[in-house]
């Protein structure tokens, strides 16, 4: 289910509360009908991409595995419960393992180009994603002054 909040409450705290609470988008009044239609189309495209079994794959990075067909994440074999945005961040990182993403790039890729959210929201989501991954949290590196990327997977020496 895609959740879009349409509200007259436009304070940053209200927006972050709504998005952190699981909303996929937050639109404040006043807004244009064309803007709302465009935002709905974006959410429908994302939903189609996520729900299409032809696009399903298993992504692995070190001890973390993502099954995109069943929307399931495991770290060291244990199931990890993620919010939609945390999941989308992790998938983006794993699909582009050596790329450094700025906060702005992550906002555009995960929340959408028309999203008006403070860039620190990304930091909060990265922090909670790291906590949920537990011992695997070190796979997401902070690149000071730039953004975030996946850490190199340690190579296991052949016996």
Show where each model-derived region lies.
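His-Asp phosphorelay/catalytic-motif detector in bacterial-type signaling
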Residues: 1-2, 116
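Conserved active-site beta-strand element of glycosyltransferases/polysaccharide synthases
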Residues: 149-151
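Residue-level preference for alpha-helix termini and adjacent loops
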Residues: 12-15, 58, 63, 100, ...
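A generic "binding-loop/recognition-motif" signal
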Residues: 9, 65, 146
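Short, Lys/Arg-enriched segments at the junction into DNA-binding effector domains
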Residues: 42-100, 104, 153, 158
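Heptad-repeat coiled-coil signal-transmission/dimerization helices
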Residues: 33-36, 40, 69-70, 122, ...
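Positively charged, aromatic-enriched patches within helix-turn-helix-type DNA-binding elements
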Residues: 23, 72, 77-146
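Basic, amphipathic DNA-recognition helix from helix-turn-helix-like DNA-binding domains
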Residues: 2-60, 159
